[in-house]
Amino acid sequence: IYNKFFGESERNVREALELAATMSRCVLWIDEIEKGIAVGDNDGGTSRRVLGTLLTWMAENKSQVFLVATANDIERLPPELIRKGRLDEIFFVDLPSPAVREVIFQIHLEKRGLSVDRFDLPALSEHSDGFTGAEIEQAVVAGLYSAGAADGVLDQALLEAELAATVPLSVTMAESLARLRQWCQGRAVHAGA
């Protein structure tokens, strides 16, 4: 989207939005939106103009394009973007619950051709408290590498060892997570399971 020439970034955004409109009914997914439109003073105003282009489209668009955006740091988003009328709702997705972690393990074990019957999913869920889905997936991948290096097969003990060796972001970034959870109180709909 971003281009080094003046005005090209805004044109790229307009073209992408026009393409979405021609494809409607559709969902337009903007992943980590704060990285593309966080407003700062170090880009010559490009981010501000890109934001303006998006806001204008959101206000004027009549096509059936459902806009969904994710953000890891919602506080970096400008208020004019997240106000009611621009976004219908703000959802907060917290860390996965124990039941959801079991499903995540099942998905990633089966994806790699492993029988989940060989694993105690509730125990794995307990050992992965505070883990994100990506961290659970990485523990499975790391366990497979460790098993392969030892000419063995991934088993419960090896996977639990990988989990024990992992420091999840909920620990590394505990203060940031606490601030995010606090910010979301009364401002966002909790979408957790």
Q: Which ranges hold each PLM region?
A:
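C-terminal engagement/docking regions of AAA+ P-loop ATPases
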Residues: 122-140, 149-193
